[in-house]
From Swiss-Prot:
NCBIfam families according to UniProt: HAD-SF-IA-v1, HAD-SF-IA-v3, PGP_bact, PRK13222.1-2, PRK13223.1
Gene3D superfamilies in the cross-refs: HAD superfamily/HAD-like, Putative phosphatase, domain 2
Organism: Pseudomonas fluorescens (strain ATCC BAA-477 / NRRL B-23932 / Pf-5)
Keywords: Carbohydrate metabolism, Chloride, Hydrolase, Magnesium, Metal-binding
Single annotated GO MF: phosphoglycolate phosphatase activity
Metal-binding listed as a keyword: yes
InterPro entries: HAD-like_hydrolase_sf, HAD-like_sf, HAD-SF_hydro_IA, HAD_2, HAD_sf, PGP-like_dom2, PGPase_prok
Cofactor(s) required, per the database record: Mg(2+)
Catalytic activity: 2-phosphoglycolate + H2O = glycolate + phosphate
One Gene Ontology term, aspect cellular component: cytosol
Residues bound to Mg(2+): 19, 21, 182
Protein name: Phosphoglycolate phosphatase
Length: 272
């Protein structure tokens, strides 16, 4: 039985929101290379892939602080040094996606959902300047109608603001929405938004099993979302399906829109 069949009583969610790093793509090798290059320029020892794998998930500024502290807690880091180190990291990572790969089943799942008419959004804590180039290189960006980076809004996950915004824009309630992620921040954001969360066992959760965060379901492969493992599923229907707009428009939310976002969220939360 697929995740959709378990969570939505034989129906598809109308909206599926995805995390990026650790969910759709394994970006740790490139992130680790950028972190190590940053550390070497600061006269420090490189951290290595396994350490970086436990540090990612809360955005680039926190990753840099953890690398400087050489610990997950990121304590005792000088703010000025952290700011300079972040510039070094950003420069190193800007065009560094050669080692990043799409996880098995990700492309097939996105393609299947797109064919079923399910709206999709990408909500990541990765700085937005890195998101579009990565999606283009991985050839998965066209599937997402809304793309929100970690610095697009004043809040990032685990704050649910981005989830509320996407649901508002899609006119889809939480009961017909799903979030797919791999970390504690993803699960907390989904729970705060009243959205079911499916978590991937293989992602980045600071070395802790994602099941400890109590998502609605844990899966080992994105194909597990799909009825019949990507086979046609005539028995699975969209609830109250709304015809999609003509064309394949993609909305990349920018910082210029954040005031409108906050106002919209405030009105929506008040009505709720």
């Amino acid at each position: 039985m697929s995740a959709f069949e378990q969570l939505f009583q034989g129906r598809l969610p109308r909206l599926v929101m995805f995390d990026l790093d650790g969910t759709l793509v394994d970006s740790v090798p490139d992130l680790a290379a950028a972190v190590d290059q940053m550390l070497l320029k600061l006269g420090r020892k490189p951290a290595g892939v396994e350490a970086v794998r436990e540090w990612v998930g809360n955005g680039a500024p926190m990753l840099v602080r953890r690398a400087l502290a050489n610990s997950l807690e990121a304590q005792g880091v000088d703010d000025v040094e952290a700011e300079y180190a972040l510039e070094l990291f950003n420069t190193a990572y800007e065009d560094s996606h050669e080692l990043t790969v799409v996880y098995p089943g990700a492309r097939e799942t996105l393609k299947w959902l797109h064919k079923q008419g399910v709206e999709m959004a990408l909500i990541t804590n990765k700085p937005e300047r890195f998101v579009a180039p990565l999606l283009d290189q991985m050839k998965i960006g066209r599937y997402f109608r809304w793309i929100i980076g970690g610095d697009t809004l004043p809040q990032k996950k685990p704050d649910p603001a981005a989830l509320f915004f996407v649901m508002k824009m899609a006119s889809v309630p939480a009961s017909q929405s799903l979030f797919v992620g791999d970390s504690r921040s993803d699960v907390l954001a989904a729970k705060a938004a009243g959205v079911k969360c499916v978590a991937l066992s293989y992602g980045y959760n600071h070395g802790r099993p994602i099941a400890e965060e109590s998502p609605a379901l844990v899966i080992d492969n994105l194909r597990a979302l799909i009825p019949g493992c990507l086979e046609p599923a005539a028995e699975i229907t969209l609830p109250d399906a709304v015809p999609s707009h003509s064309g394949n428009s993609i909305v990349v939310v920018t910082r210029k829109l954040w005031m409108k976002v906050i106002k919209a969220l405030a009105r929506w939360r008040w009505r709720a």
